[in-house]
Structure formats: C-alpha cells, structure tokens
C-alpha cells in the first residue's frame, strides 16, 4: 500500500488503509505513507481516539466446508502426491502442522524460496527446494507425482520452472491452499481458500478417518 499525503486530515484514512493491508493475510505487503515536508508543517486538530492504542488481530480464515471436502477427495484419489510448502506456511506458523500432515500420510514435501526455514532440513520427508532454484530430488519426484498440494505458495516461475518442472506428468492435478483467491486459482488448480494451518488441520482430520496413505515405498529415501 502506498499513499501520498496532501492534506493533514488525510493521515487518518491513510493509516487505516495501511493497517488494513498489513493485517490482511491475502494482500499483505509493505505499507508506505509519503509525507511531504510542506504538509508536515501544517496543523490539524485530530480527535483523541486517533491516538489511542489499538491492537490489530490477524484473523485465520477457515476454508469453506465444500472446498475442504473437495481437497480431501482429491488427495484420497492420489497415489503419489507431493506437497509444496511456500511462504504462507511461515506466515501462518504452520511448519509443525505441515510436518505432522506429511508424516501421517507419507507425503514428500519440498520448499519454495519464500517458504524455506518453515521446516527443518533434517525432516525425514523433506526433499529440498523445487523449481529452477531447487534441487534434483524434488524435481525428479515431480515426474511421477499425480497431485501437487501447494500450501501458501504463489506458484511463480521459480517454483514451476515456467510449468516445465511441475507438469511433466500430463495427468497431474493441482490443489492450492492459500488465503488469496487469486493465487489459489493459478495453474487451473482446485482452490481451497483459507489459512495454511487451520485448513491443513481440517483436511488432515478427514484423511485420518479415511485411513489414507500414499503409494510411496523407498522413493523418498
């Protein structure tokens, strides 16, 4: 978010918009308020409430039941899925949940540049980075995987290799878990719009009821 202040009273709406962007998990980013020197010299009687302390809560968006059930059915139908952990996993503090999810169903996990450090490199199901800046292990596994589960990733060209990495299997499907509706619908993905942590927990509970396991044997080792 960027705004240039031309009148002192404009600061009130500009600050509200800045905090709106900073606390929006889908559209979050930097906020810049440009305050020219001449405006700084002007006076304005701001109301007292404008200076009172306010704590902004970042809400966790829960995915719609229909989308959660759709995600569950996609994963159940997959024999060799792969999870891609993006920057949204770090923002959601969902690293532990991702590891629990992968261990429960024997799903390999790769990390994007933005998502790196959300999981320890020593995690037994981690196959390292993916895409043009990734490693051999994750990119090779993509050849045979039938479902990509993107969690908190924007699926940019560094991750997809301009689609040349993720789409070597012509029958591959994509499930995108993201707080942003735009990023959740990239690559013709089946969307599941919600916070990474709570959405994975909801999907995991249903998959455990179904006793789901992947068909991987020693490929991940």
Q: Which residues does each predicted region cover?
A:
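Short beta-strand elements at the ligand-binding edges of bilobed clamshell
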Residues: 3, 56-62, 121-134, 185-200
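Conformationally flexible catalytic loops at phosphate/diphosphate-handling active centers
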Residues: 21-77, 210, 217, 221
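Conserved thiamine diphosphate
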Residues: 1-25, 144-145, 184, 189, ...
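Glycine-rich beta-alpha junction loops
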Residues: 35-41, 87-89, 116, 155, ...
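Short beta-strand segments
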Residues: 6, 32-36, 84, 150-152, ...
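Anionic-ligand anchoring segments at beta-strand to alpha-helix junctions in alpha/beta enzyme folds, i.e.
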Residues: 63-64, 70-148
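Phosphate/pyrophosphate-binding active-site segments
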Residues: 9, 32-34, 46-47, 171-221
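Phosphate/diphosphate-binding loops
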Residues: 17, 130-186, 190
């Amino acid at each position: 978010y960027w705004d240039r202040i031309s009148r002192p009273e404009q600061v009130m709406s500009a600050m509200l918009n800045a905090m709106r962007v900073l606390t929006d998990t889908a559209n979050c980013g930097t906020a810049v308020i440009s305050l020219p020197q001449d405006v700084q010299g002007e006076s304005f009687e701001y109301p007292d409430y404008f200076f009172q302390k306010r704590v902004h809560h970042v809400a966790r968006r829960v995915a719609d039941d229909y989308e959660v059930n759709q995600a569950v059915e996609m994963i159940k139908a997959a024999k060799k899925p792969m999870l891609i952990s993006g920057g949204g996993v770090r923002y959601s503090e969902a690293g532990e949940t991702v590891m629990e999810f992968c261990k429960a169903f024997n799903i390999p996990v790769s990390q994007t540049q933005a998502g790196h450090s959300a999981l320890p490199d020593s995690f037994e199901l981690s196959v390292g980075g993916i895409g043009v800046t990734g490693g051999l292990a994750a990119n090779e596994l993509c050849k045979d995987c039938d479902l990509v589960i993107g969690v908190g990733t924007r699926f940019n060209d560094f991750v997809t290799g301009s689609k040349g990495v993720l789409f070597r299997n012509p029958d591959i499907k994509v499930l995108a878990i993201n707080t942003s509706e735009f990023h959740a619908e990239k690559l013709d993905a089946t969307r599941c719009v919600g916070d990474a942590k709570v959405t994975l927990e909801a999907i995991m509970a249903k998959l455990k009821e179904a006793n789901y396991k992947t068909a991987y044997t020693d490929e991940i080792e």
